[in-house]
């Protein structure tokens, strides 16, 4: 029963709003219409070397957090997909990016793959526990590519197969 479910993460409470935090790494004097979005289900990534190296090379980077920062126990992956969609929507509609590329580092790889699958053909209406998270109604915005860095299977075992077709795709996105 959805009326019995109240989101308590992301400072949501009964307000119906979820608070998300992130850090844009935007180099000066390097305009871009492409954003590289790093997101992990339960941690932030701005202190890792790759986001800062990409920004230093002139690329626009967002290190986005979900509503579960540093909280693996409370994680609901379906909600994290909704959070990722909110970041993508913000990047396109409010910040003017034409292309958004997901960069899946570690658990972000399985998150990016899950997001990509659900945006293209949404099937999830509830969590395995029966919590109401309807991705078929979430209107997840599209992405223009996915890059995997040290991605792994994840707890949910969502990342099972790689295809060699991904080699060289980054050149097409730039």
Where are the regions a protein language model picked out?
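N-terminal cap/lid segment of alpha/beta-hydrolase-fold proteins
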Residues: 1-34
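Active-site glycine-rich loops that stabilize anionic/oxyanionic intermediates
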Residues: 33, 38-45
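Hydrophobic beta-strand anchors of alpha/beta hydrolase catalytic cores
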Residues: 36-38, 61, 146
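Solvent-exposed loop/turn segments at secondary-structure junctions
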Residues: 42-45, 68-70, 107-109, 153-155
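Conserved alpha/beta-hydrolase
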Residues: 51-73
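Catalytic nucleophile-loop/oxyanion-hole region of alpha/beta-hydrolase
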Residues: 67-101, 121
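Primarily recognizes the serine-hydrolase "nucleophile elbow" in alpha/beta-hydrolase
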Residues: 90-93, 99-173
